[in-house]
Amino acid sequence: MHCKVSLLDDTVYECVVEKHAKGQDLLKRVCEHLNLLEEDYFGLAIWDNATSKTWLDSAKEIKKQVRGVPWNFTFNVKFYPPDPAQLTEDITRYYLCLQLRQDIVSGRLPCSFATLALLGSYTIQSELGDYDPELHGADYVSDFKLAPNQTKELEEKVMELHKSYRSMTPAQADLEFLENAKKLSMYGVDLHKAKDLEGVDIILGVCSSGLLVYKEKLRINRFPWPKVLKISYKRSSFFIKIRPGEQEQYESTIGFKLPSYRAAKKLWKVCVEHHTFFRLTSTDTIPKSKFLALGSKFRYSGRTQAQTRQASALIDRPAPHFERTASKRASRSLDGAAAVEPADRTPRPTSAPAIAPSPAAEGGVPGAPVKKAQKETVQVEVKQEEAPPEDAEPEPSEAWKKKRERLDGENIYIRHSNLMLEDLDKSQEEIKKHHASISELKKNFMESVPEPRPSEWDKRLSTHSPFRTLNINGQIPTGEGPPLVKTQTVTISDTANAVKSEIPTKDVPIVHTETKTITYEAAQTDDSNGDLDPGVLLTAQTITSETTSSTTTTQITKTVKGGISETRIEKRIVITGDADIDHDQVLVQAIKEAKEQHPDMSVTKVVVHQETEISEE
């Protein structure tokens, strides 16, 4: 049978397949023609009309799914990857970009003016390379279709952004395009028209994260896959069973009305495929039964995203050559890190988790019990105490120098408590290595603490403070105000709940605590009463940011105490995850970020607290 497939680059691929060929046979031939190895994200679509399509089932014969001849299909992205950077090959990302360009132009992926200009500039950079005034005319952007309603203002903005790019390769431009496109609310959403039980027109959207409900182009509800227990359809009705919430006792079923039985079945199949591909680690098959069975036997027969990533990791071939059709530029993909991590990408924000969240908790069947929950708390306190700058400071006497040397001593207190001699989870060698790494980390941290330097804000605040007194010449008296006090405390605690022993009624914890305190004190003058002054609070500010796996709370307080301005910054980072976390790496990262953000301040206190919960099997 003769087949005709419209590709994403507006070309047509024609071939002849056997009469009993299945959908996977044709898809495999198309991917071989395009030199695509990561083919599981793509599929072949049959278009009923201009807005409605049906995916070709890979496991069934083509002739049973197509009405009449000719056999016309389109090659499209079926499963939009949540993180395109994890795709192995640049050619896969390029075809994903082509699909997203079609989605934008057709209006399926709405964008703001600023986003359209940014994505359009990356499209031009990918197709044409760096701006060259000798090659590119005054309106070279008008040759590209970048938006549904493309205006001259948009083209001028695209040209302005494109001219600012220097030495950005096509692969880097594609990756930047995808990094911005994946943040759009309608990215990868498959839309289906429906009605609610009251007959109000709505649209149901299926994506990698779950089922979305839209009304008048606004999202009014969301059902993530972990909360969906069952998906079913009956005649033209579509039902989802929702897991009960914390305050609920029973499961709830929500129904929707679709235009026809065929539309309800198509929506059900799309939901099953998306749930299986993005949530499960492997596909399951229905065992063949000799008796008549009720219900649909449809199951997603392809590979899941987890299996696709495993297969992609085994790809061992040179980066393939492919032609960018818009400009007819032969492009060779970048190798390795240059494509995945371009040099001009912005660094990870400070509030982002230092450890990537593990997909283990998201994988699997919805409702599967989580066997291990782990919470990591890293608390970093940055404190700066500084004396006001003085114009004329007298040289200290020899007695004062000796007294200060005597007082600048080290007081170290180490308390060790081990309530259990035998660890049920770790060997003694592992415990010794862990403790040695913590001790080495503390030692390196204590040696690398920089001297605090006054910031410009505190200098101005101290100079104009109403609590400071000036003499006749306008100079600050040297005897007034308390001297500089430096304090530094490091506390690291490691607590784990051991697996239950043979006595079922009692849990014996393993507690290991080490405390190290180093204090530097300067001499106090007799007439100084700065410690009795509680100080005056100038400002207090709390900033909280959240990501999918961490919460960062930053509290900034500024006080004036006896003519001394004090700035205290306390940052609390709570990281939750279901995988083993490198505690030392988290601590090093937190200290490093605190020093980079506030180079003129010193870290005085670091507290690491770990909570591990192990449920009964």
UniProtKB/Swiss-Prot annotation:
Q: Residues annotated as region Disordered? A: 308-401
Q: Has the keyword Phosphoprotein been applied to this entry? A: yes
All copies of the FERM domain together span 1-282
Q: Positions modified as Phosphotyrosine?
A: 13, 413
Query: What PROSITE patterns does this protein's entry cite?
Result: FERM_1, FERM_2, FERM_3
Q: Which InterPro entries match?
A: Band_4.1_C (IPR008379), Band_41_domain (IPR019749), EPB4.1_FERM_F1 (IPR021187), Ez/rad/moesin-like (IPR000798), FA (IPR014847), FERM/acyl-CoA-bd_prot_sf (IPR014352), FERM_2 (IPR035963), FERM_central (IPR019748)
User: Which residues does the annotated region (C-terminal (CTD)) include?
Assistant: 467-617
Q: Where is this region: Spectrin--actin-binding?
A: 401-466
Q: What are the GO MF terms of this UniProt record? A: actin binding; calmodulin binding; structural molecule activity
Q: Which SUPFAM superfamilies match?
A: PH domain-like, Second domain of FERM, Ubiquitin-like
- Bias (Acidic residues) occurs at 387-396
Residue stretches of biased makeup (Low complexity) = 348-361
Pfam families per record: 4_1_CTD (PF05902), FA (PF08736), FERM_C (PF09380), FERM_M (PF00373), FERM_N (PF09379), SAB (PF04382)
Give residue numbers for the modification (Phosphothreonine).
169, 489, 612
Positions carrying Phosphoserine are: 312, 331, 333, 417, 427, 437, 462, 465
Q: What does this protein do?
A: Protein 4.1 is a major structural element of the erythrocyte membrane skeleton. It plays a key role in regulating membrane physical properties of mechanical stability and deformability by stabilizing spectrin-actin interaction. Recruits DLG1 to membranes. Required for dynein-dynactin complex and NUMA1 recruitment at the mitotic cell cortex during anaphase.
What protein name applies here?
A: Protein 4.1
Q: Which species does this protein come from? A: Bos taurus (Bovine)
